[in-house]
Amino acid sequence: MSDVVINPGREKGEPHLPDAGLLCVNPGDAAQAVSLAKERQGLRHFLFNSNLFQIPAADQEKPYFMAGPAVGAPMAVLTLEKLVALGGRRIIVYGWCGSLHDTVRIGDVVLPTWAVSSEGTSAHYPLNVRPESHSDTRQALKDLLIDGGLTVHTGPVWSTDAPYRESRDQVKQFGAQGIFGVDMEYGALVAAAAFRKVELTAVLLVSDELWSGTWKPGFRSKLFRKKSSSILHLLADFCAG
């Protein structure tokens, strides 16, 4: 490990987090997470320009944390680093992705394994092996989501810093290689988590389709928003289980 100038740490007065928690990438989901955390008597803490709530144990439920938003690889990893420094060890990331494959449709869920990284953050977390999401948690989440009536795909994704620069050739190439979706954060998050030796799993709701060469957005519909909220509640309950 290189001799870096700044290491993440817990400052005076900052909380000791439970080991399990949920990081919501998107602002809309993070806003719903704030409301849910308040309903569950969550204690709010400072976290950059994001939110952080510590949810206490209740009845048979374990304590956990909820954080977000954290859009883009640099902010997502900055947030992850702080969560790990505060005690997070088993982190579920909830976000959205675009579909690169004709079998993956709006409203489906992708559970990413590894990533093709075009973002600039993951390279700062060098590893000897390709990082992947935590397999046991990924399988448990797959079972949970399927039981909830969702269509689930497990496989690699492409992470990019520039969604407005995704070319048709790239979409076609990655789709042909079996890359299911494209997002902005996962490749960096899974690399940083492996570097810090913590467990990370991601759940990506398909918000739009790119595979045809014509962009098809789906995130504006009420049905999509309702499904996104439902998944958020499922994941919060999973963290408490």
Each language-model region and where it sits:
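Metabolite-binding pocket within alpha/beta catalytic cores that recognizes anionic/polar moieties
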Residues: 1-139
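Flexible, glycine/charged-enriched surface loops at secondary-structure junctions
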Residues: 41-47, 150-155, 241
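Short acidic/polar active-site loop segments enriched in Thr and Asp
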Residues: 89-90, 180, 199
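Active-site rim beta-loop-alpha module in soluble metabolic enzymes
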Residues: 128-177
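Generic non-transmembrane alpha-helical segments
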Residues: 140-148, 192, 234-241
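Zn-dependent metallopeptidase/amidohydrolase metal-coordination segment
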Residues: 187-223
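His/Asp/Glu-rich mid-to-C-terminal helical/loop segments that flank catalytic regions of hydrolases
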Residues: 212-241
